[in-house]
Design a protein with these regions (language model features):
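Core catalytic region of metal-dependent phosphoesterases/phosphodiesterases
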Residues: 1-18
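Acidic, His/Gly-enriched loop-helix segments that form or flank divalent-metal centers
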Residues: 14, 21-132, 136-142, 155
């Protein structure tokens, strides 16, 4: 769709804020790379995004993991996951000093915030049933990390 004044007038403030966030977080590069794909690849990506979920729940060897991009905004243990907004999972960073779950076998696995900014180290960070796995691969002194939930073995590239 062409971006005209009329089109922009149809946006409410919330939509404009979301568009602004996207523009500030790589929209131009995303569009340029998307346009290079075949129509079939573009269709597959759009279908994937339409089925996107903001979180994934996984149980491994009696441990429960909530996998999210960033964290859980406005967290309450009594609040069900479907009561959260997608922004709570994608943008809101957790408070590492507050345990979110009383159950020692419940964990929140997050990315988004490089561990370099949490404790100054490019390694997987564990605290209060949080597991932060973004080790700042995009930074000169960062690394790409992977955590095997079956064994809790850490891998770094």
């Amino acid at each position: 769709q062409e971006i005209t004044n009329e089109f922009l007038d149809s946006f409410d403030e919330e939509k404009l804020m979301k568009l602004s966030d996207w523009m500030n977080n790589g929209a131009f590069q995303t569009i340029q790379e998307f346009k290079k794909l075949s129509k079939e690849e573009q269709k597959d990506i759009i279908e994937y995004l339409m089925e996107f979920t903001a979180y994934e729940e996984v149980e491994v060897k009696g441990r429960y993991y909530l996998l999210v991009h960033a964290g859980l905004g406005d967290f309450s243990e009594e609040k069900s996951l479907d009561e959260y907004d997608v922004n709570d999972f994608v943008w809101k960073r957790p408070d590492w000093d507050i345990p979110y779950f009383t159950d020692p076998n419940k964990f929140v696995v997050v990315g988004h915030t490089p561990t370099l900014g949490i404790n100054g180290k490019p390694e997987i960070f564990y605290k209060n049933n949080f597991i932060a796995i973004d080790c700042g691969a995009c930074f000169e002194n960062g690394t790409l990390a992977c955590l095997c939930l079956d064994t809790m073995e850490e891998f770094y590239v």
